[in-house]
Amino acid sequence: MTINIKYSSKFSSSKTSSSEELKPKTYIPAYYQPPVSMPKYYVNWLRIKLSLNKLKNIRAIYLFDQCQNFNQYQESSRKFSAGQVSSLTPWYSNFSNYSTVILRMKDTSLPPLENPSNGGTYLFNLITVFPSIALSFNYSWRGDTGPSISIFSFSLSVLFFSLFPQHKNICARAWCRPFRRSLSFSLRFIMSSEPASSSTEKVPEEPHPHSIKHKFQGPQFVIPRALSDYVLNVNNQTPESYEKALNAKYGRDDYITLCLHVTSLCTEYGPLDDGPEYVLLCDSRARVDKLIEDLVKLLEIDTDYVQLELHGGKRLHLQKPDAVLRDIAYKQSNEGSDKFFLEMKLVPSESMKAKIMKQEEEEEKARKHGQYQQYQEYHQQHQAMNDGQSSSSVPSTSSPSCSSEANRKEMETVREPAGPSELMRAINAPVAPAPVVIKIETPVALPEEDETLMDDDEMPSLTVEAPSEEASFEAEQPSPQVPQASIEGPSQQQQIPGTSQQKRQVARGSRTNMISYHDLPPGTGNAPPMACPQVTLKLEKNVPFEAKIRAVAGYTRKPISEVQKMRPSDLESIFHSICIASVQRIKRRNELVQQLQEINAQSCKSPTMTMNKKFTLAKAYQRVQNEIEKIDREQILPQQYMNMPPMPPQGQQRLPPPAYPPGILPPQQNRQQGVPPQFQRSPQFMIGPDGQRYAHPYMQLPNSNQRARILNTSSVQPSEEVRNRLVKIEAMAMNMAQLNPPRPPPPQPPHRALQGELQFLRPGAPDPCNFRPDSKQTYNNTYVTVASPATLTNSIIPWHFPPYEKSGRLNVSNTIKAINEYRLLCNSRQADPASFLEFYFLGDPMPHFNKILSIADYNMYLSRRRCDEADVKIHRMSHSDQLQLYLLELQSDESNVEKWKTFYRIMQWDLPLNNEFPRILLPSSLDIGRPVVDRKKKSIDQVMNHIHRMHSQRPPSMGNSSTSSEASSTSPTNAATATSSPASNRPTTSTAQPPTLNPT
């Protein structure tokens, strides 16, 4: 939310020697509207007070340093020729070494006014005291009620700058939207190094909405440092310092650019439009602490209550107060000019925090002794007295419309009781009509003058809020912290009579997200604190060297062979850093767990907790909980690498895992040794009653007679040796049937391109090439395109496919099949449907030969290679097109023509003739990647004539050698080519559509 904090600059007026008709009757102090992030230096201010009282007079005041050549300009007065405006009277005065300026109208640039009562545009020319420097601005207003508007007024404050002749042709724009008025206002500044003329003045065009100029559009301020010192240091304004400021020279690297963004004003009627972005040129040789001092002096900030903090954006880093902007700012080469972002924040000072803490202690003592009700009444009376004194000391600067009785009654409907006097005095003094928008994390907006003040129970979270998403700078997100008691309000549980929750919700604004008590996480509210166990980490001292190598290889994601070549000292340092990172991660997790316990304890502290504090605690709880879950997901301890199997000796690769469990003989060895079927899955070694490892009794028998005698256990008893080792064979077989369940069916053989290769690389592992995500599909169940991404991402496989050239053909059927398989893969992996083809797009280009890949990357490139071999062509799509294609679910035998048209439109293909789908693209060098018609539906007579013609042209030795199996083994493209007529051998046209068969 936003709080409107008001400031004003007061100037003591002095009498002049001008005539009485030019002297104003009443003087209203000029004011300005600085942005939320103040620029670095402000020098000369153009303070314009435009008061349209009954549409008669327009007044302008220009405060500037005294100049000798002021008399060379001629005073002029112009009159309006339309509407109710009768005269334009320029007047000027002298305010403590400040001169005035002439305001004259450019009658040649006035556009015709069709209906002056409903709207109009007037252009003026404002001449400054600098020679050859001119400022022209135009303004327009729109009235919604027509000629009946008799009295309305508004005020506009503009920041102006001092411009030297070397800076020319600087254009800027400013916008002002009056509060609760059907009135629009705009200003346009044009700076040039030549005297302004009424005939050649042109208004610059607005930049393109997508250009860089439009992004940084707004008033530009050129502020030299020497003149800034002269204006800000009023006590040191001497003729010598003035001459020094005017004669100061600046190099190209003596100034930098700061970009400032004005956030939107938030009122009880909702947020207004966002303000402009300001571009400021300032001295690069200045220090950060000097910048803060100038801003405090310029804004007249009372440091006893509020302190100013500067935060750099994504381009400016304020590390030290004594740092120079030139040293801490770095340039960006990809932009046309150097721009830096700056953010100003107003936070409670240390003395203000001490007062708030002292007041909280008094409340706690009064609550303990049962005198809390009397303390509340005393605090309300004392606060009302302080508010009355502070309001009487501030002069009233409201305009006639704001001080009208109707507006006063309207604002009384949403008035709230005042907050703590100390904080409100710091925020509201000195008061001026124009607000400064400061981002502060509170649920109440404090608008202009007559607006509602903040309630006491809404004061607790006076903390600086992170910048909004619409801001031009990117500030770092603060780490989740528990709300401290030092920044809470003085009376949290105070409920003022006469106020209601509904009124407070109106004052909060439309951007406040309310969270009910049921939305709070478990552990907050009145529930007891939740037990959050902390994790302890114990590192072993004597870690094997092999475990260290595995830990470093897993942490750095490098092969073990490469890690083994490292020096032992480097290996020890990396392993030590891994251990330190694990300790820090566990330490951070324990701190977060302690914060959760503090949040739970604070939520159960008082039963009458306000909704604002509930909302703040819920957000903090969720933020801390998410960070703990993130740490748990990323936590990898060095002890995990110690549980891995031992490494092979130096220079040898790790052996692949066996195809069968330990102790189980393969079927071929069982058949060679003549093992009966009931013992083929028995282990070669068994554990006896004493815990020792014994060989299988069947394997210990030397000849076939003894084996047959053991099998017939009903008549022949086993020998003493077998009895001592293990009991009956039947019991052993029964136990093995219980302990070793039937083995699952072996995986299907891999694709023909990988026959014998994957089994050599990973024998016994499940084959990821045969992807079967959905077994319910009975049609077209030949998955030969997409390889499934395996879950074992740590395994590595070399890419053993040589490079190849992609064909220019397009197979529509295979493309549809590939899209359906990618859709099934997306469903099985629960991926985003709007990105289900990313697995296809990321597979191009192919890796080089023998490149080491993970299982997931290997399957991704393998799927893309299979698609290219099957003539699958899918262009790069947006996420919306991918989602539409995902929801289409087109099949090769689809009968809906609209689906086919939608599919061809998404794939950016030309529709075939007569809506005959699907079609296959024939080889063509003229047009690649577009499906065309290759055949038409033929009648039975045409087919018989075609077969008769083919038999007559074929030699007798060939006969009918083409069978259905050969036709099925050929690719769809070859089949289509074989069945086409000889006419298809003609040269293709530019549309790549071969002529069709003609009936005989």
Curated annotation (Swiss-Prot):
Region (RNA-binding): 633-720
Highest taxon listed in the record's lineage: Eukaryota
A molecular-function term among this protein's GO annotations: RNA binding
Biased composition (Basic and acidic residues): 406-415
Keywords: Nucleus, Repressor, RNA-binding, Transcription, Transcription regulation
Keyword Repressor: yes
UniProt feature coiled coil, ranges: none
Keyword GTP-binding: no
Localisation: Nucleus
Assembly mode: Binds through its N-terminal region to the N-terminal region of sop-2.
The protein, known as: Sop-2-related protein 1
Lineage per the UniProt record: Eukaryota, Metazoa, Ecdysozoa, Nematoda, Chromadorea
